[in-house]
Amino acid sequence: MCGILAVLGCSDDSQAKRVRVLELSRRLKHRGPDWSGLCQHGDCFLSHQRLAIIDPASGDQPLYNEDKSIVVTVNGEIYNHEELRRRLPDHKYRTGSDCEVIAHLYEEHGEDFVDMLDGMFSFVLLDTRNNCFVAARDAVGITPLYIGWGLDGSVWLSSEMKGLNDDCEHFEVFPPGNLYSSRSGSFRRWYNPQWYNETIPSAPYDPLVLRKAFEDAVIKRLMTDVPFGVLLSGGLDSSLVAAVTARHLAGSKAAEQWGTQLHSFCVGLEGSPDLKAAKEVAEYLGTVHHEFHFTVQDGIDAIEDVIFHIETYDVTTIRASTPMFLMARKIKSLGVKMVISGEGSDEIFGGYLYFHKAPNKEEFHHETCRKIKALHQYDCLRANKATSAWGLEARVPFLDKEFMDVAMSIDPESKMIKPDLGRIEKWVLRKAFDDEENPYLPKHILYRQKEQFSDGVGYSWIDGLKAHAAKHVTDRMMLNAARIYPHNTPTTKEAYYYRMIFERFFPQNSARFTVPGGPSIACSTAKAIEWDARWSNNLDPSGRAALGVHDSAYDPPLPSSISAGKGAAMITNKKPRIVDVATPGVVIST
């Protein structure tokens, strides 16, 4: 991942303004520690903090067309860039960067080229010939982007909120799958798949078609000129990512540079479900496995840094981001710059445990659509920013456009969870990789119950967070919560604690509105709470809150006094430590 910042039409082309843009761009330097670039054209500034993944030697940004009349700064990866270059034989390229093709596509097709891009991206393109600009964000918001407006009429775009929040009168999240044009001064949706309008699909389930689509998605993401690995929690999604990567690595260009030995990474409290399952999967696949331990106190000590980097006060996101944030730092210290991860599967296939209660296929499908549309505010935000905080890139094959087209066209009746028929959550995905002759995974891993990342790293992690928050948030503070925080009022002491930290870093009113709110049970949308009357009394985002579904569900339901932080158990804090169970099998260096 890289960091981009653009300031356009600021009515100030002075040296002081240039210095200010450079200062703000440096706030994004953690995202791209390899190179800093800035292009100024009059009162327009395009800056870039580069994490060099493709063509590290010559792919510095901003990038240009042949006569430098078109300038582009990009955060992301374009997996089909070689194919796109072949479609433009008359154009000359300065670098081997996958992102350079964007400038040339604009020359040929104007603003109507974005849907040709296969990848994850946010970009700002300045057309100096016509004195205009366009900005766009990938289909579901894998890469973050914010847009803001200054009192002087300027438009600002930044990979993270911290790049523009102090200088804009108003700012907001740039909507995924959209393009913003200065010519119209408005957004236009460029990503319009059939599932987006929530029409119920009817395609029959074909396990081999689904398997092939996912394998293709993983193979695309092996495009790299730097060392890489996979995040492996031992759950279904990350295990499939690891299994498919291990199976296809040998024939890839990446193997020619870095060898065929795949590295896998896992984090958790000692004895956590994820650590045990991940180690078993790693042994089965033959990966070089790196296991990192953290304590509850390690996580608590990192909370402020996590909220600063993730830029949210959402409870679920912070719970899950903290272990990932700690793990990303250790991964980067090994010389690895890119990892492949399993985000998106639960949204596409209805993998969260509350989907057991979906009353019919129509409600099931509508909820998956709502979840995918909201991914950019939750799991995409976490996966991108928790890793980018340390200059590490995360790629997510489940959110491949072509794979989503296949998966979301399946009749949702096939996705429905029906224990009487032996169909647990994500059955269609499990069945697609249940190969008796050439197995991808052991059966008990392939059919392991869903764990949310914040649960799987160790159940005492969430309990410890609640106990810590209870020490810092009093009952009197909770009584005044609605007056202090009228928007997205925190209803638990844990939520109040995170909100206090967030407001210290991002006090602007616009910042508060970038974070989603509303009731949730086990990561559901507010609409899905209607599926079970009991859920309205136990609104906790943990998967264990799905009463009657999770093997380790809260039983009995937590009293409201505990959910607000009262009477929580004391946590014994151990000396922080991180353990490498497996050392690298090959030398990895930056």
Curated annotation (Swiss-Prot):
Domain Asparagine synthetase intervals: 193-516
KW Transferase (keyword) present: no
Source domain of life: Eukaryota
Key words, A-Z: Amino-acid biosynthesis, Asparagine biosynthesis, ATP-binding, Glutamine amidotransferase, Ligase, Nucleotide-binding
Any one Gene Ontology BP term: L-asparagine biosynthetic process
Principal EC category: ligase
EC numbers on record: 6.3.5.4
GO cellular component: cytosol
Catalytic activity as recorded in UniProt: L-aspartate + L-glutamine + ATP + H2O = L-asparagine + L-glutamate + AMP + diphosphate + H(+)
Active site: residue positions: C2
UniProt cross-references to Pfam families, sorted A to Z: Asn_synthase, GATase_7
Residues given in the record as ATP binding sites: L231, V267, S341, G342
GO molecular function: asparagine synthase (glutamine-hydrolyzing) activity; ATP binding
Chain positions of site Important for beta-aspartyl-AMP intermediate formation: E343
Protein name per UniProt: Asparagine synthetase [glutamine-hydrolyzing]
